[in-house]
Each structure stands twice: as C-alpha cells, then as structure tokens.
Swiss-Prot record:
The active site is at R237, R292. Its cofactor is Fe(2+). It comes from Arabidopsis thaliana (Mouse-ear cress). It is an enzyme of class 4 (lyase). InterPro entries: Jacalin-like_lectin_dom (IPR001229), Jacalin-like_lectin_dom_plant (IPR033734), Jacalin-like_lectin_dom_sf (IPR036404), Kelch-typ_b-propeller (IPR015915), Kelch_1 (IPR006652), NSP1/2/3 (IPR035429). This is Thiohydroximate-O-sulfate sulfur/sulfate-lyase (nitrile-forming) NSP1.
Length: 470
C-alpha cells in the first residue's frame, strides 16, 4: 500500500505518472539552462527492472545519474521551484535525493525559489508534469504495515531504602535487579555515592555492598549502562565541577574497579549519554568544564581500550541531554540541547566508522532534551523531557512535557504510544529522569525513575512502559 504525495511545482505541461513499484533503483536528471530539463527513473519489481519514460526533454547540458544500492532506498527529496524568465508556470530548478543510508545525489543547500520536500517513508514511485522541462514532481510513499507498538504504563510499587527524591542520576538493569547511582535533589548538589539496588521480585530497594575502587565523588549528571553482569559508570560531576572517571561494578562480587582515571579517558563531562552493545560501551556528547561536546567514544570491554569514533559533521551539533541507543548494530543519537532544544536524529555505523543524519516523519515529538529513552526491537521509545530551557538554566525547572513516542528506525516514522490522559498511571510531565531498557514480568520496555517536576520538585516514583507487541 502506498500514499500518493501531491506534486509540487507548476501546473503547466502534461501529467505523467510512473505508478508504484517495490523500489527505485536509479534516477536520471537532465539539466536545462535554468533548472531541470527532464527526469527518468528505473524501478524494481522483484527481479524485474522497469525503465520509466523520459519526462521532459534532454539538452546538451548533460544527464546526471544517481544509483541506489540494492539494500537502500530513497526517503527524502528536496527541491526548489521557480518561475523562470517569461514562464507563466513554475519549473523545478533543483533536486537533491537522499537515501535511508545517507547517500545523497547533491549537497542539500538553499537555492533561489520556493523549497519543497517529498518524504514520509520509503519512496516507491514518482509522478508530475512536464513539457520540455520538468514543471512539478510528486512521489508515492510506501506505508509501513508494521503493527503499532502496543503497551501501557504501570507505576511500580517500591519498598525499602531507595534513592528517594532525585534527578540527574543513572539506572541500569542486570537480571532481575535495577541499579541506581548518583543524582541531585538540590540543583547542582549531588546527594550521595551509594549504589542502590531494586529487587524486581520483592519490589524492594536496598544499598548494595561495595568493595574495591569505590568512586570518590558524589556526582550528578552521571550515566550508567550494563553489559552482562557488569555495570559501567562514566562521568558526572560534583558541586565544584570535579569529574568522575570510568568505573565498572561487578554485580556478582560487588566490586568497583577504576578502569580509566579521569585524566586518561575521554573528555570529563556530565549530562552526556551512554549506551552499550555486547562488547562496547558508548559515550556521546555532554557538557565538559568548558563546552558542550558532540564526540562519540567507545570502550571495548574485551580489549579494554577506548576508541575515538569519527567526528560527526556540522549538522550534529555539540549537545547534552540527547537520547543514545544501540539498535541493530547502529548507535542512534536522538534530539538533545545545544543552547536550545533540537529535534534532529543521526546514527553512527561502527563497522564503517561513519555518521548519517536521517529525516524522520509521522507524529514527531517536538524539540526536547533530558528525556527518558529505551531501545525496544527496532524502535526507540522516549518519554517527556525539557522543551524549553529555564531562564535560571539548571537551577530552574525549565518547561517540561510528557508524552510517549516511538521511532521506527527502519521506516523512520514516529508514532505516539500513550493515550492523552486516558491512563491513570501515565507519568506526569518531567525531565532529567534516569531511564533504561528493561524487562519486567516478562515484558520488555522503558523503565524510568525520578526526575525533575515542572514545580522544580523531584520525583521518587518508578514507572515502566511495557510492550505487549512489537
């Protein structure tokens, strides 16, 4: 099933329509003196290649070819349209085509005329109008047949001596236990350096015994992930902006180890993002003593070495409070704060050591940072966050929001998951929460603890968005 996107441009010329196919394999664009003279597309249906008609007229200025790899597809077309010379109707003056994997036919740049875009999923056909030039262009977009994620929020009962009211901390799951470390109650004042452990069977918090290289700083803006039975903790700062190094905690022996002193590892920071796969721990962005960062570093737990990943392009600005998740071998950076809230999405391919920015669509969440996030199958699920900075910066609450959204990393489509006030246990607006991917009572989902309230108070609740189908 495909949706027909309206053709953008002028009304002059004959209408043409290539129809719908499985994929687009090649695009031919002919140049005219003032814009696009003609286009032609090659499509794929199964093993058959279908060569479309020429729309417009070739000139002596040549033809450019753009080939799409067999395992890739077009997700975004950007163009400009304008009335040229004495034309009574607009023509297309510029086209740039971008694929899911980030391949582009031309650098996307501002041009004279009116900008238009065609996107919304996998593009599987084109239509438009033409005379001796291309006057308009539209597209067909394949609609995903993926079933919407079905789930609901529950408030998890808590007993025992837990983290209590706090924000800016980190949590991670190992087996049937959730661990919490760091955080603040009063702005910029870390609370303690206990490692709290929540038993999912008894719903009871306790303070974990600790031996070895116990972190010497109580810290806020810290992040923590788990790989197997080991927790990894990086960064965070105290009230005087002294920073923590990189630690591991073996949950089977309750032993801390200082893996990398603060002066030997990646740039010390707070309010960064962390994620992990089976062999690597990733650290992205955050705020150092002097600036925000946009670097990605990975630590291989087998080799016990840091690797500084390739530098992203200018479009991935330095930021804190971003979502960072590993999905199907790619490391995804979602939104964040670079002086203002942003809504761009990028992924890093560790095999190619390459960054790609993607264009998302659907029911997109507004710009935000310091939200809860989790990776569930091919989806990234987020909740809440800050949508506008407070005039007092971190001392104030900022403008905080709610809402549960999921990004399908294959189709690049966002959807809203929760109901609008329809569930009693839906969390209230908040940011600066601690969150992780978790499995509770056999369901995988997003678990989050605490956070900052719109009143600038702190939460101490524990919520879980469990997925029934994915």
């Amino acid at each position: 099933m495909a949706q027909k996107l309206e053709a953008k441009g002028g009304e002059m010329g004959d209408v043409w329509d290539d129809g719908v196919y499985e994929n687009v394999r090649k695009v031919y664009v002919g140049q005219a003196q003032y814009g696009i003279a003609f286009v032609k597309f090659e499509y794929v249906n199964g093993s058959q290649v279908v060569v479309g008609d020429e729309h417009g007229k070739k000139t002596e200025l040549g033809v450019e070819e753009f080939e799409i790899d067999a395992d890739d597809y077009i997700v975004y077309v950007e163009g400009y349209r304008e009335k040229v010379n004495d034309m009574t109707s607009e023509m297309i003056t510029f086209l740039s085509i971008k694929t899911f994997k980030g391949k582009t036919s031309h650098p996307i740049e501002k041009r004279p005329g009116v900008k238009f875009v065609l996107h919304g999923g996998k593009i599987v056909g084109f239509h438009g109008r033409s005379t001796d030039v291309l006057h308009s262009l539209g597209a067909y977009v394949s609609l995903s047949s993926t079933i919407k994620l079905l789930g609901k929020w529950i408030k998890v009962e808590q007993k025992g001596e837990g983290p209590g009211l706090r924000c800016s901390h980190g949590i991670a799951q190992v087996g049937n236990k959730i661990y919490s470390f760091g955080g603040e109650f009063t702005p910029n004042q870390p609370i303690d350096k206990h490692l709290y452990v929540f038993d999912l069977e008894t719903r009871t918090w306790s303070i974990s015994p600790a031996t070895g290289d116990v972190p010497h700083l109580s810290c806020l803006g810290v992040r923590m992930v788990s790989v197997g039975s080991t927790l990894y903790v990086f960064g965070g700062r105290d009230a005087s902006r002294q920073y923590n190094g990189f630690y591991s905690f073996d949950t089977t022996t309750n032993e801390w180890k200082l893996l990398t002193p603060v002066e030997e590892g990646p740039t010390p920071r707070s309010f960064h993002s962390m994620a992990a796969d089976e062999e690597n721990v990733y650290v992205f962005g955050g705020v150092s003593a002097t600036a925000r960062l946009n670097t990605l570093d990975s630590y291989n737990i087998v080799d016990k070495k840091w690797f500084h990943c390739s530098t992203p392009g200018d479009s991935l600005t330095a930021r804190g409070g971003a979502g960072l998740e590993v999905v199907q071998g790619k490391v995804w950076v979602v939104y964040g704060f670079n002086g203002c809230e942003v809504d761009d999405v990028h992924y890093y391919d560790p095999v190619q050591d390459k960054w790609t920015q993607v264009e998302t669509f659907g029911v997109r969440p507004s710009e935000r940072s310091v939200f809860a996030s989790a990776a569930i199958g091919k989806h990234i699920v987020i909740f809440g966050g800050e949508i506008a900075m407070d005039p007092l910066a971190h001392v104030g609450p900022g403008q905080l929001t709610d809402g549960t959204f999921a990004l399908d990393t294959e189709t690049l489509q966002w959807e809203r998951l929760d109901k609008f006030g329809g569930e009693e246990e839906t969390p209230s607006s908040r940011g600066w929460t601690a969150s992780t991917t978790a499995t509770i009572d056999g369901k995988k989902g997003l678990v989050m603890h605490g956070g900052k309230a719109p009143t600038n108070d702190r939460f101490d609740d524990l919520f879980f968005y469990g997925i029934d189908s994915a």
